[in-house]
């Protein structure tokens, strides 16, 4: 009996040590779980913030500038704008301003994701239907084509910058009705013509005939022509071989490279 009591006393520290280890492990597990839950919560909060920002963009930037098209508003609510900007620019994705997606380099100008409010007005002006075949000029990172994918039948996006074209292809991988073509912006994509709509994602000094010739009879080209305060949103319509031009509203939009008017020399 005495031996048994001595063995129990000798074993007591070991049992206490085991219990301490168990409690410590429980504490570590609880801390790990707490941190994991917090990380997941932060992720959910980030998603909720983007969703909330998207809704605020529609309510406070688009509706307030007379964008009333249900299909256009739904497209802006559906497509995550933050997925089409660089990581460091994601907090700026839903501010009503242009967002730089490619810095200027080697003589090439910077490229931008268009400010939401003029972009939405231009898409509304385009009056896209589910049967339309759309050609976007200047795909950039793919955001505008993603919007068109929600309201058009087929979308072809042309981008001449190889880095941006690769980025657009990756961003649009799950948009099954969109294809990205790498090539000259002002050449368009004649192999896929004619198009119901050609949309130029940036302002231009002049619209080349090479693009207008790719319109279907009754098709239209939507763009912003001119720079700064003199820029106007325009729709060019092809009817029986004749192009008509209509001016709609002022729009300040970043220029797209390759559409400068040829300069005339005066002697």
What are these regions, as identified by a protein language model?
Residues 6, 81-84, 177, 220, ...:
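Generic structural signal for secondary-structure transition and capping sites
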Residues 7-9, 15, 22, 34-35, ...:
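Basic polycationic patches enriched in arginine
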Residues 29-32, 43-54, 195, 213, ...:
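SAM/dcSAM-binding transferase cores
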Residues 32, 42-133, 151, 164-166, ...:
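Class I SAM-dependent transferase core
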Residues 123-244:
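Conserved nucleotide-cofactor-binding alpha/beta core module
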């Amino acid at each position: 009996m005495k031996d048994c009591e001595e063995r129990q006393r000798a074993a007591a520290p070991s049992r206490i040590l085991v219990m301490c280890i168990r409690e410590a492990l429980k504490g570590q597990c609880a801390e790990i779980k707490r941190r994991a839950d917090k990380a997941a919560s932060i992720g959910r909060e980030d998603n909720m913030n983007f969703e909330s920002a998207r809704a605020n963009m529609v309510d406070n930037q688009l509706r307030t500038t007379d964008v009333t098209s249900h299909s256009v508003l739904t497209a802006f609510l559906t497509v995550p704008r933050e997925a089409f900007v660089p990581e460091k620019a994601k907090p700026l994705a839903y501010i009503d301003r242009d967002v730089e997606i490619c810095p200027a380099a080697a003589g090439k100008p910077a490229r931008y994701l268009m400010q939401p409010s003029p972009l939405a007005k231009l898409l509304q002006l385009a009056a896209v239907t589910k049967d339309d075949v759309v050609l976007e000029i200047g795909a950039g990172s793919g955001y505008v084509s993603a919007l068109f994918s929600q309201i058009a039948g087929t979308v072809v996006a042309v981008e001449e910058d190889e880095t941006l074209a690769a980025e657009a292809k990756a961003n649009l991988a799950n948009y099954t009705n969109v294809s990205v073509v790498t090539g000259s912006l002002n050449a368009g994509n004649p192999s896929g013509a004619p198009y119901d709509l050609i949309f130029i994602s940036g302002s231009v000094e002049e619209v080349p005939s090479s693009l207008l010739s790719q319109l279907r009879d009754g098709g239209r080209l939507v763009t912003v022509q001119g720079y700064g305060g003199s820029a106007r949103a325009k729709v060019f319509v092809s009817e029986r071989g004749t192009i008509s031009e209509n001016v709609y509203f002022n729009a300040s939009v970043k220029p797209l490279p390759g559409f400068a008017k040829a300069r005339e020399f005066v002697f």
